[in-house]
């Protein structure tokens, strides 16, 4: 069952908790003149996500499908969404468009974004941040809704567990525990820590969002700059050299 929660004006977190994984998966729908879905979820979740989206908009009117990088929980049901919404166009980094997305889903070629480029969907404007290997993958990027000051941060601030949809409390301790669990198991190396990681995280923090919307875990509301800098320090401690 999908849980729907409005995290900002006309911006909805659509979440399913999967007990066997101990993990929640969130998609975000921005209801606007040109509706935008951030993350599709994997193919197996498509019927649930589609039903949830249908409770908020006519799903056939979906115009944009945004995602950080090429991975099943980010864009695995892209084909299904393009069948359900004929005008739905992927929006991702230019690198993602060139190296993966247009080959995978040629029906509607992706809008490839470069760093600082903006997409307007009606009332909302999204600034694209090119963030190679943050959270992971060469083509990674993030979307900042400058209208609501919401940063859609993909796997950053990842927290395991069945947690509340929105919190003003720090999520750093949860994120640290999650990273320690990941590093101790077969999924170690989930978030690579490279030469440019800290610089990229500081550049993301400089956006000063007031809402930070992670795919896995509670959305954080408050001083987003502080939250991301705390996360950056934690990541350096756990994963850095």
Predicted feature residues:
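Metallo-beta-lactamase
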Residues: 6-9, 92-214, 218-223, 233-235, ...
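Short, glycine/acidic-enriched loop or turn micro-motifs at the edges of active sites
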Residues: 42-43, 72, 158, 219
């Amino acid at each position: 069952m999908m849980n729907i929660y409005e995290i900002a004006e006309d911006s909805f977190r659509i979440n399913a908790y999967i007990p066997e994984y101990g993990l929640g998966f969130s998609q975000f729908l921005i209801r606007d003149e040109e509706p935008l879905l951030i993350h599709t979820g994997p193919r197996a979740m498509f019927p649930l996500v589609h039903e949830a989206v249908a409770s908020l908009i006519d799903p056939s009117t979906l115009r944009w499908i945004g995602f950080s990088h090429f991975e099943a929980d980010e864009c695995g049901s892209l084909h299904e969404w393009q069948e359900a919404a004929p005008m739905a166009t992927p929006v991702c980094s230019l690198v993602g468009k060139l190296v993966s997305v247009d080959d995978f889903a040629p029906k509607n070629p992706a809008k490839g974004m470069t760093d600082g480029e903006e997409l307007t969907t009606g009332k909302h404007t999204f600034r694209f941040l090119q963030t190679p290997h943050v959270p992971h993958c060469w083509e990674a990027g993030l979307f900042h809704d400058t209208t609501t000051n919401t940063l859609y941060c993909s796997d950053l601030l990842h927290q395991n567990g069945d947690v509340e949809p929105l919190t003003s409390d720090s999520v750093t301790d949860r994120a640290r525990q999650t990273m320690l669990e990941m590093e101790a198991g077969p999924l170690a190396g989930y978030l690579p820590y490279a030469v440019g990681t800290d610089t990229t995280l500081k550049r993301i923090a400089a956006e000063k969002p007031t809402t930070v919307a992670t795919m896995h875990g509670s959305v954080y509301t408050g001083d987003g700059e502080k939250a991301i800098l705390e996360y950056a320090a934690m990541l350096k401690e756990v994963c850095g050299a």
